[in-house]
Amino acid sequence: MAEKLPPEVQAQLAKFQQLKDQLDRLLLEKSTIENELREINKVLEELSVLNADATIYKIVGNLLVKSDKTSVEKELNDRKELLELRSRTYQKQESILRKQLEDLQAKINEMLSKYYPQGGQTGIKA
């Protein structure tokens, strides 16, 4: 039978798992933002080839609403700016979380080697 881990190691492992879950959620949100940014860039590229007086329709809920090119471009550029800001924020948070996970992983491995010095192979990997 496997030995039960000391409470302080269990607490650190729980913290490690929480940080890992937090990183996973952050990466999912970041991916969603990056996908939306790519879509906005494609739409802006398509709009750039249209005449200024071109008729444009945008989806609002379940409706197609007539709009002008300038206002649609402004809305898209505003949204793009907001998403880019969020993306930069998420990149910083990701970096911080990865560093915390790395530090915690080293701490847990150190604790495990203290409790199980003969094991040699005991440790966790991110």
UniProtKB/Swiss-Prot annotation:
Identification of the protein by name: Prefoldin subunit beta
Subcellular location: Cytoplasm
Family membership noted in the UniProt record: Belongs to the prefoldin subunit beta family.
An MF annotation (GO) of this entry: unfolded protein binding
Record's keyword terms, sorted: Chaperone, Cytoplasm
PANTHER family: PREFOLDIN SUBUNIT 6
Ranges that cross the membrane: none
Quaternary assembly: Heterohexamer of two alpha and four beta subunits.
Annotated GO CC locations: cytoplasm; prefoldin complex
GO biological process terms held by the UniProt record: chaperone-mediated protein complex assembly; protein folding
Annotated gene: pfdB
The UniProt record lists the keyword Transferase: no
Summary of the function given for this chain in its UniProt record: Molecular chaperone capable of stabilizing a range of proteins. Seems to fulfill an ATP-independent, HSP70-like function in archaeal de novo protein folding.
Keyword Ribonucleoprotein annotated: no
NCBIfam families noted in UniProt: gimC_beta
